[in-house]
Amino acid sequence: MKELMVVSKVTTNGVGSGGIIIGAATSAASEASVTPPQDLRERVKDYGQDDVFALWDELSLEERDFLIRDIRSLDLARIDRIIRCSFRSQGVPTPEIEPVPETSVSKVEERTMDERARWWKMGLKAISEGRLAVLLLSGGQGTRLGSSDPKGCFSIGLPSGKSLFQLQAERILRIQRLAAQSNDDTFVPIHWYIMTSPFTDDATCKFFESHGYFGLDADQVTFFQQGTLPCVSKDGRFIMETPNKLARAPDGNGGVYSALKSSKLLEDMAKRGVRYIDCYGVDNALVRVADPTFLGYFIDKGVASAAKVVRKAYPQEKVGVFVRRGRGGPLAVLEYSEMDPSMTLEINQTTGRLRYCWSNVCLHMFTLDFLNQVAHGLEKDSIYHLAEKKIPSVHGHTMGWKLEQFIFDAFTYSPSTALFEVLREEEFAPVKNANGSTYDTPDSARLLVLRLHSRWVVAAGGFLTHSVPLYATGVEVSPLVSYTGENLEAICRGRTFHAPCEITY
């Protein structure tokens, strides 16, 4: 199901395929009567969903109006296809899983300085020519962090107090400057597409507006919403959250593909001359947004898709890993919950590493042509993951299914995928759980940032003092000053910084 997409600077009137009826000429108020509208009753009955009107007689006129609008907003044919295809896919034997071929991975220890410099230069050139767009997955709330705000609004407690959104925006600003310097000071803005959800869209837009888009031009940022889908029972029937309202849930971060398609943003990218898309999740405090090295590697390899990966920290780590599905088949991500415990312990006798060691950390690069292919392919196949959850319903919380697609579902459609190994301590500081949890907290992410930046400062000839143990603190380098530790010698050499502090111009 696709709801009407609301896009900052871009609006759409059509949603997905199948002809959703939204904003019908006849208002729901004039339709509400003793019985539900005849055409609507017939539509829901055709798809076996007539239970949505089971409590009609108990509803007020206003509640009936709301229910009619809620049902009319659905593309019932599309949703029925999704439910049938997703249920049918359960229990279907999957291709045999094989490890990722070593030749598919660019490993840190095998890369030369010359290669890195060449990829960096290639990436900056493409950026300076306007060929890269950045795509941010930001539909989640910070509930697990103890906040009702969008996760990107969250501050992990750095000396600057900057939010995740601000850190990422300033990295874009820095790369724009570096790209312009590499191309005779010709400035081309990087367009930033930010996917929100119905639960975070308004707050996200207001946060950017109130902070002046963190120095970016407002017209280089586009917000768009992912869709939602009805939650369903074990027999595929819609669950009613209240007598007059469907229980719905976001369609997963993989909903980005259909959202880009239905909001016509793939066409928008093409008009802007974009050829490559850097895609990432909001909850990584060390994400290198618009990384020229990764982009240059991607262009050099000539593949349709690529992903940054880190090696599993230990066999039982709860992360999805890249695998090959079937002999000679495509690369795909296998969730840790899908792995047999014995698989997690298997060792590659040649390398001495785990056979299944390449963790997916949601740092991806795609060509625009491939994004178009994925958007059409996923829509055609209509297979969603079924997540069993407790769903709020008129009968209290009941077990049911949420229907989701994941960002990594794209890889099974890719004719060619390359994996690019990065170091956790340099590029992966996840912010998922509240402080006090055992891992992926704001505190752990903050320490990863401060330790990395402290190493940059020392490497540039600076000195650090501190009033608490250095392992618990450090210095923060503003992204406006340095992207990966460059440009710091003139600022740091011979100077002493008292941690914690932020280094700016």
What function would you assign to each model-found segment?
Residues G14-I22:
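Intrinsically disordered, low-complexity regions enriched in glycine and serine
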Residues V134-L136, I194, F223, C279, ...:
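Structural beta-sheet core signal
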Residues I22, S27-D219, P230-S233, I239-S258, ...:
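N-terminal glycine-rich phosphate-binding loop and ensuing alpha1 helix
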Residues H191-W192, Q220, A304, S416:
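Residues at the starts of beta-strands that form the adenosine-phosphate
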Residues M269, G273-D278, L286-A290, L295-V475:
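Catalytic core of tubulin tyrosine ligase-like
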Residues L137-Q141, P150, L158-P159, S197-T200, ...:
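An acidic- and aromatic-residue-enriched active-site/binding cleft used to recognize and process polar
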Residues G212-F214, A218-E317:
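Conserved beta-loop-beta/alpha segment of the NTase-like Rossmann-fold superfamily
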